[in-house]
A protein has these predicted regions:
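Core catalytic lobe of class I
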Residues: 1-176
């Protein structure tokens, strides 16, 4: 009832491990949101760094960030990052690169390949350092059992809203 058409909710959730098995609650929660009328607009990954090691399984280094929307999102302000090889010409996907073939192709088509720009839209796996002096400078936040980096919240808010928009935090910032 609170999210209007075009509005977005970002649900960050990880699975608990109980008696040696992951619970799968993250997927059940995403499906529940869909049953309530939300679209699952994107499934993103919050990749956590700086975690203690777990010795009986691969370390749980991520949580899901389900981007849920009422209809098509009204706003998308993509975060841009520098390209690894700016100004380099793009190669055709799924083909072996050969300088001779490239010269022949250009001669046949008369077209030059488009160079890659200096930046690109960030992918949907977002990496953040966690822990003391990384997630937040606010010591009281570390009393919360599920703290999230302030930058994660900021990046999601910037991505899905414009200045002056109403942003509702049902947890009142308790985890940031």
């Amino acid at each position: 009832r609170i999210t209007k058409d075009g509005g977005v909710a970002v649900w960050v959730v990880g699975d608990a491990t109980i008696k040696g098995s992951e619970t799968g609650t993250s997927f059940r929660q995403a499906l529940y949101f869909m049953d309530c009328g939300f679209n699952l607009h994107d499934t993103m990954i919050y990749n956590k760094t700086g975690l203690p090691m777990n010795h009986n399984r691969y370390e749980q280094e991520f949580e899901y960030m389900f981007v849920l929307s009422k209809g098509k999102p009204k706003t998308f302000n993509p975060i841009r990052i520098p390209c690894l090889y700016p100004e380099k010409e793009t190669a055709r996907q799924n083909s072996k690169y050969s300088e001779t073939n490239e010269i022949m192709r250009k001669a046949r088509s008369g077209k030059q390949r488009k160079p890659v720009g200096k930046d690109k839209i960030k992918g949907n796996i977002w990496k953040y350092a966690t822990g003391k002096n990384h997630s937040t400078k606010d010591d009281i936040a570390f009393n919360h059992p599920a703290i999230f980096p302030e930058q994660l919240a900021s990046d999601q808010i910037i991505s899905w809203s414009n200045p002056g928009d109403v942003v509702f935090d049902p947890f009142m910032g308790s985890g940031t």
